[in-house]
A protein has these predicted regions:
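Ligand-binding pockets and gating/stacking loops
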Residues: 1-319
Length: 319
């Protein structure tokens, strides 16, 4: 948040203190604010590709953009291709469904791509069985709560990689894509306050608490991010439009340094002013955490050898 910026930048929400001195969150995330000491916060995510959903989806999940029709594999497919699997347990799961209508007919980064169909992710529904009511309440009786609870079940049973799509389709729905435009992204910041942020706040907090209570948090890397940010200025419809130049992400678990803040943005959250972070760095980090040898991965395109992931892992998460 930018509490000292003009009202057109800071929007309608106040900022609140967190459990980390000097770090502030939006008032719409009070539970995560209490758990900020468990989070590594990246304030300087950015990319310079086209400002559409599909480019960000590719960069975050494959580490690079498709080249000449070549689809680079989802990070979990890379891990699955290098890992032993347990009978009946998917190594790489997408919950609850693959991304579908996100605006443009283009690759969204959730396929095995050039690795081949043997390594396609498995789509797993968010149907929950065998959990006590107290645990369900911890995550919240919401779609996102059920998705994260299902993800915890998968991790506990041996799935190596889980990707949760809070929304598989964007149009004509109230999603993070808050243009305030009924023809594409109808949500506004009012929807952030009444539904989207409360659901996210409770579900992610519930997941972190549950993993910690089960002794799984140190061995599970949790990453929460979007594929880009939103415009620094609120538009005339009380929405914000696409913005690839700067956004935030959080990482927890995996023995990361809780309370750590990586990077910073300018006074209007328009651009990074310290330690810009490429989405591919998160991809490389997830691959490295799961034991994939990132530096050894390459692909030949038009007789040219290219690294599968052109970025290094984000070592500052552990400093």
């Amino acid at each position: 948040p930018k509490p000292d910026a003009s009202s057109s930048v800071r929007g309608p929400f106040k900022s609140i203190e967190t459990s980390v001195p000097g770090v502030r969150f939006s008032e719409t995330l009070p539970l995560l604010a209490q758990r900020a000491n468990r989070l590594a916060i990246i304030r300087s995510m950015n990319h310079d590709a086209a400002p559409i959903h599909e480019t960000g989806q590719q960069l975050l999940q494959t580490g690079r953009l498709a080249i000449g029709g070549v689809k680079f594999p989802h990070w979990g497919s890379v891990v699955a291709s290098q890992s032993a699997t347990r009978m009946g347990i998917p190594s790489n799961a997408i919950v609850p469904a693959f991304l579908s209508n996100t605006g443009v007919s283009a690759y969204r980064g959730q396929e095995a791509g050039l690795l081949g169909s043997d390594w396609e992710p498995a789509a797993i529904s968010a149907e929950i069985e065998g959990e006590p009511e107290s645990i369900r309440r911890q995550y919240g009786d919401t779609d996102f709560g059920r998705m994260l609870l299902r993800s915890r079940q998968l991790v506990e049973r041996g799935t190596r990689c889980v990707t949760v799509n809070l929304f598989d389709s964007l149009h004509q729905r109230s999603t993070w894509d808050c243009h305030g435009d009924p023809n594409c992204g109808p949500a506004t910041l009012n929807d952030y306050q009444s539904k989207l942020c409360p659901d996210f706040d409770r579900a992610l907090s519930g997941l972190l608490d549950d993993l910690a209570q089960r002794g799984l948090l140190d061995d599970t890397l949790v990453v929460a991010t979007g594929e880009f940010g939103r415009t620094p200025n609120v538009n005339e419809r009380l929405g914000r439009d696409h913005w690839t130049d700067c956004w935030s992400a959080v990482v927890a678990g995996g023995r990361v340094s809780g309370g750590n803040v990586i990077g910073a943005s300018d006074s209007t959250a328009s651009m990074p002013i310290d330690r810009p972070v490429d989405p591919g760095e998160l991809t490389a980090t997830m691959l490295d955490w799961c034991g994939a040898n990132v530096e050894s991965l390459s692909v030949t395109i038009d007789k040219t050898d290219l690294p599968l992931i052109p970025c290094q892992k984000l070592t500052e998460l552990w400093s």
